[in-house]
Amino acid sequence: MASGQQERSQLDRKAREGETVVPGGTGGKSLEAHENLAEGRSRGGQTRREQMGEEGYSEMGRKGGLSTNDESGGERAAREGIDIDESKFKTKS
């Protein structure tokens, strides 16, 4: 059990130094903050998927995946002739 506490202590120290120690926990100032941020981001994505449906959520991800620092996903899709069906983005009633 002590090794688990020691590992958490090391991770907490790294988090306080600005290192990301939990996937999705970027921006937290401690290990606990990293864990809470990661959990909230995951839960937010799941909620959005439920609201939009699997198809809409996937389509939104396709568009987001096309974005770059220079242009949005929508701009790039239009320029390259990639069809993005934004009607799928609507939340379910």
UniProtKB/Swiss-Prot annotation:
Record Pfam families: LEA_5
Example GO BP: response to abscisic acid
Span list, region Disordered: 1-93
InterPro entries reported for this sequence: LEA_5, Sm_Hydphi_plant_seed_CS, Small_hydrophilic_seed_prot
Keywords: Stress response
Family of this protein: Belongs to the small hydrophilic plant seed protein family.
Induction: By abscisic acid (ABA) and osmotic stress.
Note: Wheat contains at least 10 different genes for Em protein.
Primary role: It is thought to provide protection for the cytoplasm during the desiccation stage of embryo development.
Protein name in UniProt: Em protein H2
Ranges of Basic and acidic residues composition bias in the record: 9-19, 31-52, 73-93
